[in-house]
């Protein structure tokens, strides 16, 4: 579901980045509108010079009256010289590249190869023994597949249509190359004790030959090769204390697999440009209807009573995605061959398993605001991840602007995540998301609270955010009428009865029943069961419900063969609210149908409620800092164009950056260093947007510089320390200085084990010393000792003429938690100085040895600055 927001509160600001201050969004948009198009002057001058050099010789020839042959001779000589020189240079460059960068080129080549998952992820096992087993079993697997095609699929196709009565498979050969399992992952955390969950990274590249023929029309077609790559989940549950130990086996894909098919015969036209992608998409949709979540294949190994719950899976939760806004996106639209830079027309594609949502397109804006809301079902976790991609809409092909991959396990723990995320695979850009984890509850105690929170008015029973989730399991039907004349015509129109009587030959044939379900504006359809009055579907359907007190479930059984209704029923959802455990499991008699016609269904209603975060009391103040760990990088898949979801009213929360500045300013106005401990919760909340929004990720394909030692003299060497002590004595001048004579600095320090990085957030400084009569121009420089190379240095921006600067900037250091105990954080506050009149100098220093236990939890603290950093008293 999608919605557009109403009015916003307060002027939101952009989050701080590495070395960049936060900027008000209104100011950024105003500046962006003023500079709609920026011209590359250097590029324009280069283009003009190049054109002049090409035209000027022609002018000289005409001016002196020379023959045009001179120009041709000069051109031939120039081409010969450039070709000769180019060959020599290319040989020389290849030799130098081979000698100097052999190791780098090999590493780059290995990184570009699509290696198996077990190479990149330590929790995925290679399991080569499994591939050897599959290879040994492959001939017998091929025999089973051939038997399945000939004895099951072939008769089904023949019976589907009279024109296909001569359909047959002439050749079925799966090839000699077996299915390969590139990695196996077994989940041990967040898993029920009575189940085993395995993820198999499967890959099949085979010379498969499947030929078919319809003799009646002399039509031949087939497939000559198939490639299939994807992640298949296998669930063994429930585990029982009797043979065969496992009650059932469930198999499904977490997301759509990658599929490539080469056709032959008549179907070879599907390989034509434009049709090849369409044919693969149609086949993938067919696979999704059977094998991609929420669909699955369940193989019972014990009695049906023990696995009845597997046929009626309740989703683990519902993820409400507030797709709010983005900032500093890359520009993709250019003019005059790139000399004039334009804007982008951004839109977003959100994927969760088999569910796809697309936002509206914002024209010519690098800071778009969508303010839309989507609701997606989470059927399995761990394993399912939220994928978000941004694109620039173009007439030919949409350009990629960045992507995100978010782990839903962390979102479930936090319940509500409202952060700015740095886009992956992009040179710039941030995305503002608010994620809410809604837990399905089988009680109505929170229903009134939920209805009030989503503003479920009586006149809007079918629109808006969802208050409940309806899960329906369609089992079977009994005693359906074989033809329209057997239907109980009470309540039916006379014209409909006469139309049924005129059906002629169709009256004597068996029905092809299917079921239509509708809740509000949402309609879902079951599969068609051919030539039967006792159909068995065993399908599950889910509906989002806005107001269960006022909405109804409408069910209608229809006959595809006779094109008529076979019965209907209307079930008020309030009836389910009054039932035990909010569940109905019974046979429902059909109206306007046969005398004994009924549907067997199991219907459950679950109230969607946001629970409190799942964390211990010790983690309550550090939960905000933990949020960036849910971000991971990922290569973007090819975008699809799904239909946009319906709009729902939504009002975005104010940007937390404003609260940060206000709280820190209040802290600066206070003269007591212990003012902040009175409200530790606010202090950690103020740093949430900073720690969550400024974490950057360097894509592997972007150019990076080799680390080189810093040749610039470090100002916090003994000479600078002596100057600082002298300045401190001058300030003292016979008076007694306070507890922190050089001032204090506020830092948030946390280590992310998932990303293997140390995050340091520089919030602010207070009560710094004045470097001159006009004050100081302070900035903060950070090293993680013993690394003092230029590449290991981190710097904030410079604040002019202030002794209480506010930075709110986040920096990252790549270091493991085990190695962190041997490292020291070197923080120096320095005076930036001017170009001619001021000199740089040291304002204070801090040397901090980080405890690994504290770093894993994360903490925020004020630290005293000293002359050499060795005496570091701290206040909370």
Curated annotation (Swiss-Prot):
PROSITE patterns: C2, SMP. Ca(2+) 2 binds at residues 333, 345, 392-394. Residues 686-698 have a biased composition (Low complexity). Residues 1-35, 81-876 are cytoplasmic. Disruption phenotype: Morpholino-mediated knock-down causes severe trunk shortening, disruption of somatic muscle formation and impairs the expression of the mesodermal marker t/xBRA, similar to the effects of inhibition of fgf signaling. Ca(2+) 3 binds at residues 394, 396, 398. Residues 788-795 are annotated as: Required for phosphatidylinositol 4,5-bisphosphate-dependent location at the cell membrane. It is a peripheral membrane protein; Multi-pass membrane protein. Interacts with fgfr1 that has been activated by fgf1 binding. Interacts (via C2 domains) with the AP-2 complex (via an alpha subunit). Identified in a complex with the AP-2 complex and fgfr1. PANTHER family: EXTENDED SYNAPTOTAGMIN-2 (PTHR45761:SF2), EXTENDED SYNAPTOTAGMIN-LIKE PROTEIN 2, ISOFORM C (PTHR45761). Anchored to the endoplasmic reticulum membrane by a transmembrane hairpin structure; both N-terminus and C-terminus are cytoplasmic. The C2 domains mediate lipid and calcium binding. The N-terminal C2 domain binds calcium ions and is important for calcium-dependent lipid binding and interaction with membranes. Two calcium ions are bound at a high-affinity site and a third calcium ion is bound with lower affinity. May bind up to four calcium ions. In contrast, the second C2 domain apparently does not bind calcium. The third C2 domain mediates interaction with membranes enriched in phosphatidylinositol 4,5-bisphosphate and is required for location at the cell membrane. Belongs to the extended synaptotagmin family. This is Extended synaptotagmin-2-B. The lineage of its organism: Eukaryota, Metazoa, Chordata, Craniata, Vertebrata. The gene is esyt2-b.
